[in-house]
Structure formats: C-alpha cells, structure tokens
Amino acid sequence: MWRRCLRLRDVGRRLLNLPRSGLTASEGLGPKLPTPIRAYVPPAERKRFYQNVSISQGEGGFEINLDHRKLRTPQGKLFTVPSEALAIAVATEWDSQQDTIKMYTMHLTTLCNTSLDNPTQRDKDQLIRAAVKFLDTDTVCYRVEEPETLVELQRNEWDPVISWAEKRYGVEIGSSTSITGPSIPARTREVLVSHLASYNMWALQGIEFVVTQLKSLVLTLGLTDLRLTVEQAVLLSRLEEEYQIQKWGNIEWAHDYELQELRARTAAGTLFVHLCSESTAVKHKLLQG
Amino acid sequence: MAALGSPLRTWRGLLRELRYLNAATGRPYRDTAAYRYLVKAFRAHRVTSEKLCRAQHELHFQAATYLCLLRSIREHVALHQEFHGKGELSGGVCWLSGSQVAPAAWRKGWEP
C-alpha cells in the first residue's frame, strides 16, 4: 500500500513538473522547466519598529503612542478610542509583538480600525439589520434529524439558551429541522432591532463581528448579557464539530487551530462590545449604623 | 448569569498571561499599564456588602473574557508556528510540497 502511495506521489510531482527532492520557496527552478511553480509565500511581515508603547488622552479620547509617533488607522485617521481600558488593551497588543508585527493576532486593534474608518460605509440601521438577519439561519435554531445522539445533544445544549433568550426578551424564536430554517415572527425581529438600537455604533460593530464569527445572534446576545462565557458560546457554536471530533478524533493542526482562532475573535468582539458600552460611575454607598 | 469560576482563578490566569507576554521583552509585568489597570479594577470592586453585585460580576466577566483572549491568541500563535509557520499550502495538498512539516502533521492527526 505504501509503495502505491509513493508511486502516486511521484505521478503527482511529474504532473506539476516538480523535482524529486521537493520544492521550497527559496529554491529556484532550472531554466529548462517551462512553468515554475512555487509554494505560496505570504507577504513579508512588518518588523517591530518601535521600542515603547504608551497611551495618552487627547481631545477625542485615548490615543496610542508608538515611541514618539501617534498610531493611525489604515485610512490615516488618528487612532482614538473612547475607553481607557480599551486603549490599554490595544497598547498591550502592540507591546506584545516581538520581532515582527502579526496583525492577525491584533483583533482589538482591527475592531477599532473598522469602527474608526467604517470601510463598508454602513450606518447604524444597516449594522442592526445585518445582525438580526442572522436569526433566520441561527446556528442554535437549525436542527438535524439524525443521528439520534446528535439530535439529543442539540436539544440538551441549545434549548436552554433559546428558552433564556425568549424569556429575557419576551419573544418567540423556536427551532426547526427544515432546510429553510425557523420562521421568525415579525414581532421578534422588531423587539431585537429596538434592543440593538440601544447600543452605540462602536458596540454594534463588535456585535455584528461576533454574530458573524459564531453564526448566531442568540449566542451573541448570551455573551452581551453575561449569560454565557466565551468558551461556552464557542462550544455551543461548534457543537456538531465537537460531536464529530469526539467520534472520529481530533486533528490538532486543523481543529485546535480553528478553535483557538474562533475563541480569540469571539473574546475580542465580546470585550470590545462591553468596553464600548460601559460608563464608569462611582457611587458611594451610605454608611449605616 | 454565566458560570465564571472563582475571581482568584481568573486573576491568577491573567497574571500568568501577562508574564508570558512580557517574558520576551524582559520587562517585569508589574510595570505594564495592563497590570496596573487590572489591580485598580479588582481592588475597586472588592469591597461590597451585597452578595450579588452586578458591577462586580461585570468586571469578573470582562476579566475572564480578556483572559480567554490572551490565552487563545497565545495558543493560536503556538499552533501556527508549529504547523503552519513555513508558508506551505495547508490541508490535503501538503504532500505535494515535499516539506518535512506536512508528513509529521498528518501523522500527528491520526494519533489515538
């Protein structure tokens, strides 16, 4: 069997005109080969060009300083955030970069840039509509009909979250095994639209981001209302995958990789929503007695 | 309310993650703005006579979310460097590149 696999590998190499020793990005091909095929090389990462990261308070909010330079967004605007905690978290992201700047790990910075630049040019109504639209195909509402163990798992894990959301907002959501998904009443949509309208633009960017990651508005509401932790929400979003992993085995470089990435993005989005919607007010308690 | 575990555990986890982040720079994590902010926030919400204080729960939730963020980024980067760091194609066509990473990754995936 192994000899057959090796033979197939050789056939594959010959079809792509690859040499026997394999090809790395740094090797060149000889001039006699017609079409050079190189492995994909991602664009060079930017080196860390600053020593110190600090925050300062300006007119529009908190700014990030990389040495003496003020951080700017991709569109050139001054990077300003409304909350000190968010500014500190963004500064920590920049300070934790080592030799090269790995933008794919800087989720809070990316969310702030999106809120400041608004590259998709969407207004508040459009963001709310985009988030509520996910309810039609919400992960926790879409049920399978077999195998029985997965059906039971979905019922046990997802039904309580849907019941909570229905009670919390006084709406009907339900679930469905139909390919078209659940039929969401108009009143449910109205109530959720008006609830989301109470958030500011920045928080809505975060909410829409989390909804897109988890493929579920119900789970996102669970996060914004402190009903679910990030780990719980991600597990519920990936319920079927986790079920298959339990059955067939885990592949670290695929499953764990995706799990950690989803956790990181969801955690960043959730934290972003909370930090953009809070207002710190010191209330002194009256001393009694 | 979400089951968060004990605030002390979250606090310890945050300190650990801040230590990892600052290990490369060699700077003590107690010098960072993040550490100072977290100390101030945890202290401010410690004194309360109410059993269920919403503000306290909110702070703990945010702290646990931040801990999840730091931990999952660290583990994601570690997985990226171990399995995807050489820039080769991922997934089923790894074997075409002839790189040493691909066969090991496939082997690891089939371990019981």
Curated annotation (Swiss-Prot), chain A:
InterPro entries: ATP12_ATP_synth-F1-assembly, ATP12_ATP_synth-F1-assembly_N, ATP12_ortho_dom_sf. Gene3D superfamilies: ATP12 ATPase, ATP12-like. One of its GO terms (cellular component) is mitochondrion. The keyword Mitochondrion applies. GO terms for biological process: mitochondrial proton-transporting ATP synthase complex assembly. Interacts with ATP5F1B; involved in the assembly of the F1 component of the mitochondrial ATP synthase (ATPase). Interacts with FMC1. The keyword Mitochondrion applies. This is ATP synthase mitochondrial F1 complex assembly factor 2. It is found in: Mitochondrion inner membrane. It is a peripheral membrane protein. The lineage of its organism: Eukaryota, Metazoa, Chordata, Craniata, Vertebrata. Its main location: mitochondrion. It holds the Pfam family ATP12. It comes from Bos taurus (Bovine). Residues 1-40 form a transit peptide. Belongs to the ATP12 family. Plays a role in the assembly of the F1 component of the mitochondrial ATP synthase (ATPase). The modification N6-succinyllysine is found at residue 133. Transmembrane segments: none annotated. Keywords: Chaperone, Membrane, Mitochondrion, Mitochondrion inner membrane, Transit peptide.
